[in-house]
A protein has these predicted regions:
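Extracellular/periplasmic helix-loop-helix junction of adjacent transmembrane segments
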Residues: 48-77, 116, 307, 312-317
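12-transmembrane solute porter fold
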Residues: 25-40, 45-47, 60, 135, ...
Length: 462
């Protein structure tokens, strides 16, 4: 048990039910601008890897670490920063993360070698973690309680739109400039979002306990090693490396759970996972994003290598899913303010399972419409699920634990996507060109399991 914990008390600070409209709209602009930048930078670096490898005279395998270090730094620190936000204020973590992200973007743009770029990308990942770890917690305090579902819907809309436009924006920038501009473009937006945030973000309640630094190291090590292990498996690294990383992750997680068994606000939120709705909502989130990871890794290979479509056509075929998610996100938010998330999420994931199964049994020479409507069904199901589930997860946690709940939202998303990508790689290793169909069928299974867990929320208490 940690020694740096004071007696647990209720969170202190202002109690309010959202911001007035005039201030709320500016606060929304601030947090969603930062979220857009952090989400875009997760996607656009992939497009720039060939140019980075050529310009810095490194191999493609080495250049991949530009993506890896960002993801590891991001995932490893989500829970510690979410927990720290409960103590010092979510708005401070957001502003500090945005400042670091903006400065690190300048460092990326000025990088002169792979090593300097990796350092800057690591710092950028830490900054993005500061933004993402408290983003949904801030939404909870910015919107009135009667509109919080809409707020989460807008949040999902921003992420889906960034996910949709990321490759297009990156390709457009690279068509007229060099890869450093992909990072330099963050500077004006980061400065504007920071200035607006300083004026408009609400002060959030402060928890009365000390931050457990050793627990933060354990949490970062646990999640970081898990991502390294899963990612190494996806890239067919040596089995001993994968096994050692995953075992070390489990050991650190076990130590963290033992250390925080009696903690009033544990870094790994064991107290929240004792709430059935929170636990089921987290599990369904991991399942749904694993489906997304399976689909978005396997489908491009299927379209290009099996159907022999061009890269442009592949991009067109991939668009309906995130596009429909972006359309459905605010609609799902409004519905989640009126209807139970268990029903909405269960129906959405059932629809996603149907869409994935239909993609898995595509005919040998499908027409454009045959592909597009199947992708649209997947997007409809995913969008119908995402916002109500986020609302259920956040609402099942007390306001004083919003930071940890927000960290879990982002961690579940990135963990699910990583697991899905690793399983897709495994499917291709086992089945060759049939790997895409196997991955899609596996995704349908994940969605079906998630649907059942979502409906189970109707039978449990808060």
């Amino acid at each position: 048990m940690p020694t740096d914990v004071t007696t647990a008390k209720p969170p202190s600070g202002p109690v309010m039910d959202g911001l007035p409209w005039e201030r709320r709209r500016w606060a929304i602009a601030a947090i969603f601008t930062a979220l857009t930048m952090a989400s875009l930078d997760t996607a656009i670096a992939n497009i720039a890897l060939p140019a980075i490898a050529t310009d810095l005279h490194v191999s493609p395998a080495d250049a991949v670490w530009v993506v890896n270090v960002y993801q590891i730094a991001l995932v490893a620190t989500l829970l510690p920063l979410g927990a720290l936000g409960e103590i010092v204020g979510h708005e401070r973590i957001y502003l500090g993360g945005l400042l670091l992200f903006t400065l690190a973007s300048l460092g990326c743009a000025m990088a002169w070698s792979l090593d300097s770029l990796l350092v800057a990308r690591t710092l950028q990942g830490l900054g993005a973690s500061g933004v993402m770890s408290v983003n949904t917690a801030l939404v909870r305090f910015i919107y009135p309680s009667r509109m919080v579902g809409r707020g989460f819907g807008h949040n999902a809309l921003v992420v889906a739109t960034a996910f949709t436009l990321g490759p297009t924006i990156a390709s457009g920038i690279l068509a007229i400039g060099h890869w450093p501009w992909l990072f330099a473009i963050n500077l004006p937006f980061g400065i504007i979002a920071m200035l607006i945030g300083l004026k408009t973000l609400p002060p959030t309640p402060r928890a009365v306990h000390r931050f457990d630094f050793f627990g933060a190291v354990l949490a970062a090590g646990c999640l970081g090693l898990f991502i390294i292990g899963i990612g190494s498996a996806a890239h067919k690294a040596s089995p001993p490396l994968v096994v050692v990383a995953l075992i070390a992750s489990l050991v650190l997680g076990w130590i963290l759970m033992r250390r925080h068994a009696d903690h009033p606000a544990p870094m790994l939120p064991i107290d929240l996972f004792r709430r059935p709705v929170f636990a089921l909502s987290t599990a369904t989130a991991v399942c749904s994003f694993a489906v997304q990871g399976l689909a978005f890794v396997s489908l491009p290979f299927y379209f290009e290598e099996v159907l022999l479509r061009s890269q442009v056509e592949t991009g067109f075929f991939m668009t309906p899913w995130p596009l429909v998610v972006a359309i459905m996100a605010p609609i799902g938010g409004r519905l989640s303010d009126r209807y139970p998330a268990g029903i909405l999420g269960g129906l959405g994931l059932a629809l996603l399972a149907v869409g994935m199964a239909l993609l898995a049994v595509l005919p040998a020479t499908p027409g454009v419409a045959n592909i597009v409507w199947r992708m649209a069904i997947c997007g409809l199901g995913f969008g119908f699920f995402q916002t109500p589930n986020m609302r259920a997860l956040m609402s099942s946690a007390p306001p004083g634990r919003s930071g940890s709940a927000s960290g879990i939202v982002a961690t579940a998303r990135l963990t699910g996507q990583t697991i899905g990508a690793a399983l897709a790689a495994l499917c291709f290793s086992l089945a060759g060109h049939q790997g895409a169909a196997l991955a899609l069928a596996l995704g349908a299974g994940f969605a079906a399991v998630g649907s059942v867990m979502s409906f189970l929320r109707m039978a449990v208490s808060r």
